């Protein structure tokens, strides 16, 4: 199975606060949003946005956005149904944000694409760095990976697909 290795860095933090993770390559941006929300410990929302600055492209759940949310110099497109490989194979990074909430934005570097026939198709946090006073991420990496395995493993993925996509 193929995966993308992503380094997700919270914007505006010094020293940087980040998580390196693997996400399955055979998914669309709507499912990737759900995975990133879980990795970043956000509540599930439909108001996510992927911004590819170099392409002047923003991917969203267009049904959940207001008219003002799609104005400006960017092209806006539907995240659901658009495969992540289409952009993650060619771009170096993107910004992930949840709109309408006071939550941090994340620069997401696309580090590499890997193949691992042994690994199940679930997202996984590989490494993280956070500051001592950071109270935004409450779960440690091992606990978070256990939650991700339960939610996105073979038994949990049907529930996710039924609810989110």
Feature map (PLM): residue ranges:
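Short linear regulatory motifs enriched in tryptophan with gly/pro/ser
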Residues: 1-165
């Amino acid at each position: 199975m193929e995966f993308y290795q992503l380094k997700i860095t919270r914007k505006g933090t010094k020293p940087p606060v980040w998580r390196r993770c693997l996400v399955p390559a055979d998914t669309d941006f709507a499912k990737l949003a759900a995975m990133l929300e879980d990795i970043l410990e956000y509540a599930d929302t439909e108001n996510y946005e992927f911004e590819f600055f170099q392409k002047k492209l923003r991917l969203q759940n267009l049904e959940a956005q207001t008219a003002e949310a799609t104005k400006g110099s960017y092209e806006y497109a539907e995240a659901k149904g658009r495969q992540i490989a289409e952009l993650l194979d060619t771009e170096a990074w993107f910004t992930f944000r949840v709109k309408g909430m006071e939550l941090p934005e994340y620069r997401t570097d696309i580090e590499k694409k890997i193949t691992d026939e042994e690994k199940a198709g679930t997202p996984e946090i590989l490494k993280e760095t956070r500051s001592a006073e950071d109270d935004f991420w409450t779960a440690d990496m091992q606990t978070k990976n256990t939650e991700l395995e339960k939610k996105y493993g073979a038994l949990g993925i049907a529930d996710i697909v039924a609810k989110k996509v």
